[in-house]
Protein backbone atom coordinates (compact mmCIF):
# COMPACT_ATOMS: atom_id res chain seq x y z
CA UNK A 1 0.00 0.00 0.00
CA UNK A 2 1.21 3.47 -0.89
CA UNK A 3 1.93 5.64 2.19
CA UNK A 4 -0.07 8.83 1.90
CA UNK A 5 0.61 12.43 2.80
CA UNK A 6 -2.42 14.10 4.35
CA UNK A 7 -3.79 17.08 2.42
CA UNK A 8 -2.99 20.40 4.02
CA UNK A 9 -4.20 23.93 3.42
CA UNK A 10 -2.40 27.23 3.91
CA UNK A 11 -3.18 30.83 3.16
CA UNK A 12 -0.91 32.51 0.65
CA UNK A 13 -0.59 36.05 -0.65
CA UNK A 14 -0.39 36.01 -4.44
CA UNK A 15 2.38 38.40 -5.57
CA UNK A 16 0.54 39.28 -8.76
CA UNK A 17 -2.85 40.16 -7.26
CA UNK A 18 -1.76 40.98 -3.66
CA UNK A 19 -4.81 38.98 -2.55
CA UNK A 20 -4.73 36.18 -0.06
CA UNK A 21 -5.91 32.82 -1.26
CA UNK A 22 -6.10 29.33 0.14
CA UNK A 23 -3.74 26.74 -1.31
CA UNK A 24 -4.14 23.01 -0.80
CA UNK A 25 -1.26 20.51 -1.03
CA UNK A 26 -2.36 16.94 -1.74
CA UNK A 27 -1.26 13.76 -3.46
CA UNK A 28 -1.94 13.78 -7.20
CA UNK A 29 -4.59 11.57 -8.76
CA UNK A 30 -5.04 10.47 -12.36
CA UNK A 31 -7.45 13.42 -12.77
CA UNK A 32 -4.45 15.74 -12.27
CA UNK A 33 -2.51 14.31 -15.23
CA UNK A 34 -3.17 17.22 -17.60
CA UNK A 35 -2.31 19.84 -14.94
CA UNK A 36 0.87 18.02 -13.92
CA UNK A 37 1.77 17.62 -17.61
CA UNK A 38 1.38 21.36 -18.16
CA UNK A 39 3.57 22.18 -15.15
CA UNK A 40 6.14 19.64 -16.34
CA UNK A 41 6.15 21.27 -19.79
CA UNK A 42 6.81 24.65 -18.13
CA UNK A 43 9.61 23.11 -16.08
CA UNK A 44 11.26 21.70 -19.21
CA UNK A 45 10.92 25.06 -20.96
CA UNK A 46 12.52 26.80 -17.96
CA UNK A 47 15.34 24.24 -17.74
CA UNK A 48 16.07 24.54 -21.46
CA UNK A 49 18.02 27.75 -20.73
CA UNK A 50 20.49 25.59 -18.77
CA UNK A 51 20.38 22.51 -21.00
CA UNK A 52 19.56 22.85 -24.69
CA UNK A 53 19.42 19.04 -24.94
CA UNK A 54 16.09 19.05 -23.07
CA UNK A 55 13.39 17.51 -25.28
CA UNK A 56 10.59 20.06 -25.01
CA UNK A 57 8.17 17.62 -26.69
CA UNK A 58 8.79 14.78 -24.22
CA UNK A 59 6.10 15.73 -21.68
CA UNK A 60 3.32 15.43 -24.28
CA UNK A 61 4.79 12.29 -25.84
CA UNK A 62 3.49 8.80 -25.15
CA UNK A 63 6.58 8.08 -23.03
CA UNK A 64 6.16 11.31 -21.06
CA UNK A 65 2.49 10.63 -20.35
CA UNK A 66 3.25 7.02 -19.40
CA UNK A 67 5.96 8.20 -16.99
CA UNK A 68 3.63 10.71 -15.29
CA UNK A 69 0.77 8.19 -15.03
CA UNK A 70 3.11 5.64 -13.44
CA UNK A 71 4.50 8.14 -10.95
CA UNK A 72 0.97 9.12 -9.91
CA UNK A 73 -0.46 5.61 -9.65
CA UNK A 74 2.33 3.28 -8.55
CA UNK A 75 3.35 2.70 -4.95
CA UNK A 76 7.02 3.45 -5.71
CA UNK A 77 6.15 6.90 -7.08
CA UNK A 78 5.32 10.17 -5.36
CA UNK A 79 3.55 13.12 -6.98
CA UNK A 80 2.21 15.89 -4.77
CA UNK A 81 0.39 18.90 -6.19
CA UNK A 82 -0.60 22.29 -4.84
CA UNK A 83 -3.83 23.82 -6.08
CA UNK A 84 -5.14 27.35 -5.68
CA UNK A 85 -8.65 28.49 -4.78
CA UNK A 86 -9.70 28.10 -8.44
CA UNK A 87 -8.50 24.46 -8.36
CA UNK A 88 -5.63 25.27 -10.76
CA UNK A 89 -2.38 23.42 -10.09
CA UNK A 90 0.36 25.90 -9.18
CA UNK A 91 3.12 23.51 -8.08
CA UNK A 92 4.12 19.88 -8.02
CA UNK A 93 6.92 17.56 -6.97
CA UNK A 94 7.57 14.13 -8.47
CA UNK A 95 9.92 11.53 -7.09
CA UNK A 96 10.33 7.80 -6.80
CA UNK A 97 12.01 4.92 -5.08
CA UNK A 98 14.87 3.84 -7.34
CA UNK A 99 17.08 0.78 -7.58
CA UNK A 100 20.39 0.92 -5.77
CA UNK A 101 23.29 1.37 -8.13
CA UNK A 102 25.23 -1.89 -8.01
CA UNK A 103 28.41 -0.06 -7.05
CA UNK A 104 26.82 1.65 -4.00
CA UNK A 105 26.38 0.28 -0.48
CA UNK A 106 23.23 -1.67 0.27
CA UNK A 107 20.64 0.92 1.21
CA UNK A 108 17.29 2.23 -0.01
CA UNK A 109 17.38 5.07 -2.51
CA UNK A 110 14.90 7.61 -3.86
CA UNK A 111 15.23 10.32 -6.45
CA UNK A 112 13.62 13.74 -6.51
CA UNK A 113 12.85 13.91 -10.22
CA UNK A 114 11.09 17.23 -10.72
CA UNK A 115 9.72 20.18 -8.80
CA UNK A 116 8.23 23.44 -9.98
CA UNK A 117 6.31 26.30 -8.39
CA UNK A 118 4.58 28.81 -10.66
CA UNK A 119 6.39 32.20 -10.53
CA UNK A 120 3.49 34.06 -8.85
CA UNK A 121 3.55 31.55 -6.00
CA UNK A 122 7.29 31.46 -5.33
CA UNK A 123 8.76 32.75 -2.09
CA UNK A 124 5.99 31.34 0.11
CA UNK A 125 7.75 28.10 1.12
CA UNK A 126 5.63 25.97 -1.23
CA UNK A 127 8.73 24.22 -2.57
CA UNK A 128 9.94 23.61 0.98
CA UNK A 129 6.54 22.15 1.91
CA UNK A 130 6.58 19.80 -1.09
CA UNK A 131 10.13 18.69 -0.33
CA UNK A 132 9.33 18.19 3.36
CA UNK A 133 6.38 15.97 2.41
CA UNK A 134 8.58 14.00 -0.01
CA UNK A 135 11.15 13.47 2.75
CA UNK A 136 8.35 12.27 5.07
CA UNK A 137 7.16 9.83 2.39
CA UNK A 138 10.74 8.61 1.90
CA UNK A 139 11.07 7.99 5.64
CA UNK A 140 7.77 6.06 5.61
CA UNK A 141 9.30 3.92 2.85
CA UNK A 142 12.54 3.40 4.83
CA UNK A 143 14.64 5.32 2.31
CA UNK A 144 18.23 6.07 3.35
CA UNK A 145 19.32 8.44 0.57
CA UNK A 146 17.57 10.92 -1.72
CA UNK A 147 19.38 12.15 -4.81
CA UNK A 148 18.52 14.68 -7.49
CA UNK A 149 19.98 16.20 -10.63
CA UNK A 150 20.18 19.95 -11.01
CA UNK A 151 21.75 22.04 -13.76
CA UNK A 152 25.11 23.29 -12.54
CA UNK A 153 24.20 26.86 -13.61
CA UNK A 154 20.84 26.85 -11.78
CA UNK A 155 22.08 28.77 -8.75
CA UNK A 156 18.64 29.47 -7.18
CA UNK A 157 17.74 25.76 -7.23
CA UNK A 158 21.16 24.73 -5.88
CA UNK A 159 20.81 27.27 -3.06
CA UNK A 160 17.31 25.92 -2.27
CA UNK A 161 18.49 22.30 -2.13
CA UNK A 162 21.52 23.17 0.00
CA UNK A 163 19.26 25.06 2.44
CA UNK A 164 17.25 21.85 2.89
CA UNK A 165 20.44 19.87 3.54
CA UNK A 166 21.41 18.39 0.15
CA UNK A 167 25.13 18.35 -0.57
CA UNK A 168 26.97 18.04 -3.89
CA UNK A 169 27.82 14.37 -4.37
CA UNK A 170 28.52 13.19 -7.91
CA UNK A 171 29.53 15.49 -10.74
CA UNK A 172 28.23 14.71 -14.22
CA UNK A 173 30.21 16.22 -17.08
CA UNK A 174 29.32 16.30 -20.77
CA UNK A 175 31.28 16.96 -23.94
CA UNK A 176 29.33 18.14 -26.97
CA UNK A 177 31.32 16.70 -29.86
CA UNK A 178 29.80 19.01 -32.46
CA UNK A 179 31.54 21.93 -30.74
CA UNK A 180 34.99 20.38 -31.03
CA UNK A 181 37.16 21.26 -34.01
CA UNK A 182 37.24 18.44 -36.53
CA UNK A 183 40.60 16.66 -36.82
Model-predicted regions and their roles:
Residues 81, 88-97, 111, 116:
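Conserved beta-strand in the GNAT
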Residues 1-31, 42, 182-183:
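Conserved N-terminal entry element of GNAT/NAT acetyltransferase domains
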Residues 138-149:
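Conserved GNAT acetyl-CoA-binding A-motif
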Residues 114-117, 123-136, 140, 159, ...:
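Conserved acetyl-CoA-binding loop-helix of GNAT-fold acetyltransferases
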Residues 128, 152-170, 181:
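Conserved active-site alpha-helix within GNAT-family acetyltransferase domains
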Residues 65-81, 111:
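A short helix-loop-beta-strand connector motif used in the catalytic cores of GNAT acetyltransferases and
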Residues 44-68:
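Conserved GNAT-fold acetyl-CoA-binding loop/helix
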Residues 99-112, 122, 168-169:
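A conserved beta-turn-beta hairpin within the catalytic core of GNAT-like acetyltransferases
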